[in-house]
Amino acid sequence: MPRIAGLLETSLYVAEMAPAKAFFVDVLGLKPMLSTERLTALDAGRQGVLLLFLEGASDADMPGPNGTVPGHDGSGPVHMAFAIEAEDYDKWKARLAQREIPLRSEVAWPRGGHSLYFEDPDGHLIELATPGLWPNY
């Protein structure tokens, strides 16, 4: 059986692009790779890409010169986790406090990992997790 090499893209659907982009760039430090009115692609590390789509702007098929991207959209808050180093946990906690981003929760996992939970401007639940969360992380 062929093997999956990793998760490449994760999509979030946002009400307004500017505050969403500012949050992920200014607060979390992700680097923009592409930015249009309907889409922002951010470098999420280790070949990972976070795609921010303006709500309703990607629900129709998008024909292009090299093929058609099927339409997609989502609604409601979703959850995503970013991997962080254990030694950066307190630095991230301080950075969120400095930016006045309230923590929803902190969790100490049985395998030794720790997580910080907070929300982005669209109410999506964001997690920063250290190693020790899953058998493979």
Predicted ranges, named:
Residues 23, 88-95:
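Short amphipathic alpha-helices within nucleic acid-binding modules
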Residues 13, 81-85, 119:
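Short hydrophobic/aromatic beta-strand micro-patches
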Residues 33-74, 125-132:
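Conserved short beta-strand elements that form part of the metal-binding/catalytic scaffold
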Residues 1-18, 79-80, 132-137:
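N-terminal beta-strand motif that seeds the catalytic metal site of vicinal oxygen chelate
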